[in-house]
């Protein structure tokens, strides 16, 4: 199992190379050269999330690590979860299940991918006698999950860029209250896209690194994050019907990594009936899946801030594998020229959308109404992102009438103002969220300027 770039420049890379590089040298994203096949019969014999992970993760890591090494690593990877089996499942009615992915230490689905990344980062760095810098950007949950996953590894320093805007107090304080010498939280006077641009430029520059250091990617472009997310799709299918029936998945998304993990599950073995791409009014993905137009627009602040993104960084993987059938030259041309040139596919190619995907986009008013209805009718509290995912259900006028699994990507306790708007008086608290509100904050303020950020890293890289 080796990996290649979506733009054709990097080929035959090992898992460890892809883990440590994140972004390919040609600007593309890594993807397996061939999709491995999971053993459905062995999956049906699994009893836990860890059992699933022990079958799935080694399919992607064999070029760098023995299976026994990986299994040992996985036994200690996911920690501080509320639930012993990591994922919760809520049956709303006969047609709708909610996959609760928020029981980890930072109350968001990103704990799954980032704890796996951190464990493999540490393994690779120890093996190669290296240290590392993590430079990441966050619109909500990535930063806290990355900081929490990596803070105990002293060979890793984390610098996290926080944009101005719509992050909740709890989301921000999950990062700014971490007081450790290897963690730096930078408040950036700019948008999330400005922060993403600085991170991307860092992987081309790297002048702030010491000679024995590597720069690591924790944003959703890192393939290892995708692997961690693939595992919970298999787990949900095992728990709901033990792989006996096709399911539809509704995925609230911004950067498209969670959607691509669902698509990857399909490529490994599992028949997925439909993937619903659910977004808020930042609707670049909905415009593509409904109108064949992928065009960057200005970002709008919403009640679901983790989806307030105008460019979906993982979308390139789907274009390359699903639509273009691995035509790297065309993919490179599309994304080398984007966002200056919007992307539209030929009609014959784009029509493949109907085979697997549907999409939806809703605003804050509809989001709040869904939160209200779910609480009133089912006595269940969802956060705004999960509400966006629920809009594809037939009970809210959406296209999917049965066998629907909606991913709940964040705990509702992160979004207290949204709960007030939805007139939801009480909810089950998460074990870590209330702790951060009264802690002292530690952070630094910088302009959205790559030189300022790089110089800050240099001054603190000792």
Region spans (language model):
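PLP-dependent amino-acid enzyme catalytic core
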Residues: 1-462
């Amino acid at each position: 199992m080796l990996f290649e770039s979506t733009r054709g420049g990097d080929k035959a890379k090992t898992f460890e190379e892809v883990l440590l590089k994140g972004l390919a040298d040609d600007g593309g994203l890594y993807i397996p050269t061939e999709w491995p096949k999971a053993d459905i019969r062995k999956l049906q014999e699994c009893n836990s999330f860890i059992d699933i992970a022990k079958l799935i993760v080694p399919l992607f890591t064999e070029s760098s690590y023995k299976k026994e090494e990986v299994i040992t690593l996985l036994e200690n990877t996911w920690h501080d979860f509320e639930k012993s089996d990591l994922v919760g499942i809520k049956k709303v009615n006969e047609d709708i299940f909610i996959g609760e992915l928020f029981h980890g230490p930072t109350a968001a689905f990103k704990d799954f991918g980032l704890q796996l990344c951190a464990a493999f980062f540490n393994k690779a760095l120890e093996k190669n006698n290296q240290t590392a810098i993590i430079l990441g950007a966050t619109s909500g949950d990535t930063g806290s999950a990355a900081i929490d996953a990596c803070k105990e590894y002293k060979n890793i320093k984390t610098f996290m860029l926080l944009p101005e805007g719509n992050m909740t107090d709890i989301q921000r304080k999950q990062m700014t209250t971490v007081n450790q010498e290897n963690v730096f939280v930078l408040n950036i006077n700019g948008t999330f896209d400005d922060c993403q641009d600085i991170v991307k430029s860092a992987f081309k520059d790297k002048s702030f690194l010491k000679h024995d250091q590597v720069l690591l990617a924790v944003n959703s472009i890192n393939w290892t994050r995708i692997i961690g997310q693939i595992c919970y799709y298999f787990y949900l299918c095992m728990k709901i019907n033990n792989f006996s029936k096709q399911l539809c998945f509704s995925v609230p998304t911004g950067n498209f990594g969670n959607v691509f993990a669902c698509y990857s599950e399909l490529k490994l073995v599992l028949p997925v009936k439909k993937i619903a791409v659910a977004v808020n009014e930042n609707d670049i993905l909905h415009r593509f899946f409904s109108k064949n137009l992928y065009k960057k627009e200005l970002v709008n602040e919403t009640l679901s801030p983790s989806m307030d993104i105008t460019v979906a960084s993982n979308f390139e993987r789907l274009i390359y594998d699903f639509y273009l059938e691995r035509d790297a030259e065309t993919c490179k041309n599309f994304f080398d020229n984007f966002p200056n040139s919007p992307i539209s596919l030929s009609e014959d190619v784009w029509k493949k959308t109907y085979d697997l995907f549907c999409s939806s986009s809703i605003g804050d008013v509809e989001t709040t109404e869904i939160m209200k209805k779910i609480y009133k009718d089912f006595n269940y509290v969802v956060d705004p992102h999960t509400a966006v995912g629920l809009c594809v259900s037939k009970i809210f006028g959406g296209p999917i009438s049965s066998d629907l699994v909606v991913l709940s990507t964040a705990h509702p306790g992160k979004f207290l103002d949204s709960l007030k708007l939805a007139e939801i008086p009480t909810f089950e608290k998460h074990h870590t969220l209330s702790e951060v509100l009264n802690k002292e904050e530690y952070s630094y303020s910088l302009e959205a300027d790559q030189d300022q950020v790089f110089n800050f890293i240099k001054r603190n890289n000792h």
